[in-house]
């Protein structure tokens, strides 16, 4: 597996967004989604067969958009129990591969063109099954020459050089991953994945918003933007007043109550999982874990979440929670650092695997 001059890539393949960084000195972020023009008119308008990035939102009415990891199903859950047909699973596989390829091209503008192999470390949920990991590796075939699939929270800890006595909570759109770090790569059984995340908060917020303001017209993108700007879980001192259309007219609405209730829906499952995981270790190590909790992922930006977690552990002896300094790139930068330090036996060769072909019909 050794090569004198590969390009290394670290990738946080998120449910909603994918962040990526490379040893070539580039980093970027893109939606984990692919759009196909709905018909020949849309194809002529867009001038291409596949759409990525900001154009997915701008032209969403003209596109069949696929988010392959929506609600974490194919990254964490059982594809057979997902309700997806075989054709839909194949379409999601293709969408995943196209996202990976697009993201890698963003940060390796001269990678393959210069004849250099590309080695990548990809982060997945803590308790992703072998089937889930294989899905990601199969999707990476034809993009990377070699790959390593690792726990997402571990990449955060590795990037911060917090490799001992640390508990990482990575709150993504589809899952919350909790991982203890104590000087070695953690075993799967020692980690926890909670099958909800930012998507569940968006869903709950939209439901409560429509119940309180039945005349309001909102999209899921609008709901997500409000949450990302105003989301909070602390007791007092926050207010969220936003303009929302009613019969086409922007009208101020106080969404504080439904927003807080939706965000709080994330707290109890996370706190319960953290308490349960910490209790598995001996008392001395429990204290060290509680006093060195790292909060990462997009959900870490909810105002007051760090304090709420600390308060929830007060009766267990207290805790110290620190947010990552850059929630967008912490996982990708850590994965890149891990890739650059990976021993040859840590890589799985992918060269020679077939690339995906475009399906005849795209399942919505």
Predicted regions and their residues:
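Phosphate/pyrophosphate-binding loops at sites that engage ATP/ADP/AMP, CoA/4′-phosphopantetheine
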Residues: 103-118, 213-219, 274-292
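Helical "lid/coupling" subdomains associated with nucleotide-phosphate turnover
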Residues: 87-99, 148, 155-159, 202, ...
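Gly/Thr-rich phosphate-binding beta-strand-loop-beta motif of the actin/hexokinase/Hsp70
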Residues: 1-29, 160-188, 205, 234-238, ...
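Residue-level signature of catalytic and energy-coupling elements of molecular machines
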Residues: 18, 34, 100, 140, ...
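The start of beta-strands in P-loop NTPase/AAA+ ATPase cores
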Residues: 7, 118, 147, 164-167, ...
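Active-site neighborhood for divalent-cation/phosphate handling
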Residues: 91-162, 183, 198
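Conserved phosphate-binding loops in N-terminal lobes of ATP-dependent enzymes
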Residues: 9, 15-121, 270
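Phosphate-binding glycine-rich/basic clefts of nucleotide- and phosphate-handling proteins
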Residues: 37-57, 182-267
């Amino acid at each position: 597996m050794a090569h004198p001059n590969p390009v290394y890539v670290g990738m946080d393949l998120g449910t909603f967004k994918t962040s990526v960084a490379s040893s070539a000195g580039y980093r970027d972020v893109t939606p984990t989604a692919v759009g196909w023009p709905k018909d020949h008119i849309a194809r002529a308008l867009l001038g291409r067969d596949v759409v990525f990035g900001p154009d997915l939102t701008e032209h969403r009415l003209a596109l069949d958009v696929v988010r392959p990891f929506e609600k974490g199903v194919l990254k964490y859950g059982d594809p057979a129990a997902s309700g997806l047909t075989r054709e839909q699973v194949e379409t999601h596989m293709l969408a995943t591969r196209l996202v990976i390829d697009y993201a890698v091209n963003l940060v390796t503008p001269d990678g393959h063109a210069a004849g250099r192999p590309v080695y990548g470390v990809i982060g997945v949920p803590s308790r992703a099954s072998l089937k889930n990991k294989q899905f990601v590796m199969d999707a990476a075939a034809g993009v990377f020459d070699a790959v390593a699939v690792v726990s997402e929270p571990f990449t955060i800890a590795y990037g911060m050089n917090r490799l001992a006595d640390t508990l990482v909570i990575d709150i993504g759109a589809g899952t919350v991953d909790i991982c203890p770090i104590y000087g070695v790569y953690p075993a799967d059984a020692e980690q926890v994945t909670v099958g909800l995340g930012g998507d569940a908060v968006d869903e709950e917020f939209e439901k409560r918003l429509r119940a309180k303001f039945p005349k309001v017209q909102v999209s899921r993108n609008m709901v997500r933007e409000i949450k990302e700007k105003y989301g909070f879980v602390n007791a007092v001192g926050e207010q969220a007043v936003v303009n929302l259309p009613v019969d086409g007219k922007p009208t101020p609405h106080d969404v504080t109550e439904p927003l807080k209730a939706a965000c709080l829906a994330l707290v109890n499952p996370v706190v319960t999982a953290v308490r349960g995981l910490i209790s598995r270790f001996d008392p001395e190590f429990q204290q060290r874990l509680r006093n060195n909790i790292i909060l990462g992922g997009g959900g870490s930006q909810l105002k007051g979440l760090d304090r709420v977690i600390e308060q929830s552990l007060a009766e267990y002896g207290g805790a110290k929670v620190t947010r990552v300094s850059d929630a967008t790139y912490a996982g990708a930068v850590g994965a890149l650092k891990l890739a650059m330090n990976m021993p040859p036996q840590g890589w799985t060769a992918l060269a020679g695997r077939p690339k995906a072909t475009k399906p005849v019909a795209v399942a919505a």
